[in-house]
Swiss-Prot record:
This is Transcriptional regulator NovE. Keywords: Antibiotic biosynthesis, Transcription, Transcription regulation. Transcription regulator that specifically regulates expression of genes involved in the novobiocin biosynthesis pathway. Probably acts as a positive regulator of transcription. Does not bind DNA. Residues 1-41 are annotated as: Disordered. The keyword Glycoprotein does not apply. NCBIfam families: LmbU_fam_TF (NF038070). GO terms for biological process: antibiotic biosynthetic process.
Amino acid sequence: MVASGRTASKGRGNGATPVRPTAGDATPVDSGQPSDTTYGGLEVSAERTRLRIPRDLSLEAWCRLGGRILAVCDSSVWWIGDWLVFGQNQYGDRYRRAMKETKLDYQTLRNYAWVARKFEPSRRRDSLTFQHHMEVAALSEAEQDHWLDFAVRLNWSRNELRKQIRASLSGEEDDLRCEVQLNLQLDELRLERWREAARGSNLTLTDWILSVVDGAV
């Protein structure tokens, strides 16, 4: 378990994301004081509810700034998850203090902690977002690695990863259905009796047959 505020990637260094300004430590968010850093020789000031960007900031510097902000946002979710897991393991008072400190709701915190538990730091891919990992968190470790490796290699977005997983699961379900398909030879009278019974139960004929068979075993 880590409590240092780092993420790690599989086979790619420590995955740490720098979050302190170029000069000195970051100012605590709740202090109300700005935290300054420099891009393209120009000072950018981050406050709790505002980012002050100089008008003459170059496009290149603006892109670097945005990349850093997005990286910190994604990393901070991992940090919250690791912080919650540490608190759960160390103190047992699960979410009460966390909700008070972060002002996040119970379900959000539980999701962060759940994903952090599912992925030890060494299994996290620093080229993918927290949301990528959340998409596969319910799968087995082998399946998680399988899909995350594909996402890294093919540069899938979170939505594309979700689409591919759903398509795969849908294909598996279709295969299973094909394996259990039955062909029944019925006379018209019997078929009509079954249809009438299905209508009386507000079921399709297939669902009615399944319910009868399930009730007999």
